[in-house]
Amino acid sequence: ANKQLRQGRTCYKHLAGRLGVGLTARFRARGLVDRNWRLTRNGEELLTTWGVLPGESSTENLVTPCMDSTERRFHLAGPLGTAICRIFFSRGWLERLGATRAVRLTPAGGAILRDAGLDPGEYGSAL
């Protein structure tokens, strides 16, 4: 696969590639999404500060795991994955690379993740 697409891309309307898988792993390690793929109270609080949470009053069925085609690990899909991707683009935390599905975190996006204890590290680096 193309290096840029493998690093970060959109999969339908959510984040994929190393960026999507890495962010998902950090969400799970920090207890923002539980082992049953449900958003936790801590996850709700963080995502509310980002303006991400969809309008539903229930957090049931917000998160769907999606197997990443290049990384062979899960990334976040479903309404929550879509909302995260949409907000990251609209706030300038994520940018598309040309007319492709390839994306990368902007410096502002990296700072937001670091501030939340979700250091993007290697998975968020631009190529």
Residue ranges and their predicted role:
Residues A1-L127:
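Long, charged, low-complexity, helical-prone intrinsically disordered regions
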